[in-house]
Amino acid sequence: SLKEEVILDIVKGRSPQIENTGDTIVFSVTGKPIVPRSENQLKLVQEYEKNDMLFAIGPAGSGKTYTAIALAVRSLKNKEIKKIILSRPAVEAGEKLGFLPGDMKDKIDPYLQPLYDALQDMIPAAKLKEYMELNVIQIAPLAFMRGRTLNDAVVILDEAQNTTTQQIKMFLTRMGMNTKMIVTGDMTQIDLPSSQTSGLIQALKILKGVKGISFIELNKKDIVRHKLVTRIVEAYEKFEEKQKTLHSCHSERSEKSENIKRIY
């Protein structure tokens, strides 16, 4: 049951005050504790306490982005930082966004809506609007990060599998004093042209073993959406594995055919 102070905060449109309640990260706007719902989500929370840069890699619905945003909101409410900065690469718009109608907010909203959704679960609407007007919470496409130094912040890069190698290096080197960075991505949902290397894949290879950087891998066991999501992920994994096998067999047959032609 909710404490009287928590109920009062909700009625007055304030975020409930955070207490150290075991695994609770923050309270939702309805007063419900937001907690890690799987072993790997808990690991993400624990690694956040020990490292300034985290990479959380896993399938859709595994809670990587939601948990990351909850950690950022907790740090802001506990006055450990001064701002939260959320970003994702707008692949569909080539990171330029110039062809879309409307002002900047109208242009970026479609790509960043999932981040708004998570924030709205954790911060009352009026307070969230105030935070955004004061730039305490900033949500912007990755291209808008160039040239900035990000101090006193938790910075989250979502959908990082769709960054180029240059973009992710640019992002990671924006890190300033008293700042934590969380990079999330799903290796099965790369939307880049096949000729381009995912910046996330390259970064994972280059940064492995660097002190102060933690890597958390989530999987289908961590999926906390509708149970069908897990089945859908499994079905696609089987399909993709089958496609790889068929492609491999086709390549072998083509190679044998070429060798026979050379003989004759």
What label would you give each PLM region?
Residues 255-262:
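A cross-taxon signal for low-complexity, glycine/charged-rich
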